[in-house]
Design a protein with these regions (language model features):
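Metal-dependent phosphodiesterase/phospholipase catalytic core, i.e.
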Residues: 1-98, 114-117, 121, 135-137
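C-terminal active-site rim and adjoining tail of enzyme catalytic domains
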Residues: 18-21, 97-174
Length: 174
């Protein structure tokens, strides 16, 4: 565990290139403001420490409401259903993404219980029957982590709504 005081002293840019030396770690507020200024739609993934699922979900939801206000709210996802339930309780208006590596047999029931907007799963673990079921129900399917343009094109052609990528530069124009 590292305190906020220490985190604020770290250099987030020097290891990328000397031109970025001295760049501080971005805060949640900084990222929220940048997304709003640039017109970007954010996906906020809740990653709670074990035993802190509920409080983390609640805290993230409160922060989102404080930072986004009446602007388009970010999509909120998590592998922790408990965190998503807590976020929903605090902010019923938040669009939630049900996050799983491979959709379980009862993924639709879980999404219904969460009142989730979208299904997020690993690109390599997704089968066409899930895509078809989701499409029939009007549920967007988002896949992670897709860094290859041809893979992204193939997923979109299969009916996936969007992809998460570490290399958005390679997916330009899709």
């Amino acid at each position: 565990e590292t305190s906020d005081l220490i985190l604020r002293t770290l250099d987030a840019g020097a290891h990328q290139h000397r031109a970025y030396a001295g760049e501080p770690l971005p805060t949640f507020e900084t990222v929220a403001r940048a997304c709003q200024a640039l017109g970007l739609h954010a996906n906020v993934e809740i990653k709670p420490a074990q035993g802190f699922e509920q409080i983390t979900g609640e805290t993230v939801a409160r922060q989102i409401l404080a930072l986004w206000g009446s602007a388009q709210l970010p999509l909120v996802s998590s592998f922790s259903e408990e965190s998503l339930v807590a976020a929903r309780r605090v902010a019923p208006q938040l669009p939630l993404g049900y996050l799983c590596v491979r959709p379980p047999e009862d993924w639709m029931r879980r999404m219904d219980a969460l009142a989730a907007y979208s299904l997020h799963c690993a690109a390599r673990k997704l089968d066409d029957s899930v895509i078809a079921t989701a499409q029939a129900a009007g549920i967007p399917v988002l896949c992670f982590t897709v860094n290859d343009r041809q893979d992204a094109e193939a997923l979109l052609a299969r009916g996936v709504t969007a992809v998460f990528s570490d290399r958005i530069d390679s997916l330009r124009g899709l």
